[in-house]
């Protein structure tokens, strides 16, 4: 299982940090206290499943779709009501501004994560 640390902005597996990134916008970047604020806070704590990957015309190539592991099998997080979470790349024009809650990681890391076959993610504070 992969682990995303909300406050540190790190992706780990087996206790080893694999990459650094960010989740959230403005004051919400890697700020767990704002996880419930749509469009600003980081991806909410909990378990997620990576269900597919695709090339997005909006957020770029090798985007990974995340579904919350909760009472409803969809990409909406029941506890916060937020949804549409992805793992995708950063903005080329304005680095550090691509997330409204999605996890932003380099493409090589996204490819490695997907190809690992381990599609479970736990988001911790």
Segments (PLM) and residue ranges:
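Gly/Pro-biased beta-strand-loop elements
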Residues: 1-83
């Amino acid at each position: 299982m992969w682990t995303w640390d909300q406050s540190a902005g790190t992706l780990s597996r087996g206790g080893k940090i694999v990459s650094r990134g960010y989740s959230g916008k403005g004051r919400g970047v890697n700020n767990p206290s704002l996880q419930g604020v749509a469009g600003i806070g980081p991806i909410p704590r909990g378990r997620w499943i990576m269900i597919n990957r695709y090339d997005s015309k909006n957020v770029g190539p090798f985007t990974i779709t995340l579904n919350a592991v909760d009472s409803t099998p969809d990409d909406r997080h029941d506890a916060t009501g937020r949804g549409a979470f992805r793992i995708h790349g950063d903005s080329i024009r304005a680095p550090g501004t691509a997330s409204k809650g999605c996890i932003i990681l380099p493409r090589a890391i996204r490819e490695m994560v997907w190809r690992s076959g381990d599609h479970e993610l736990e988001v911790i504070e």
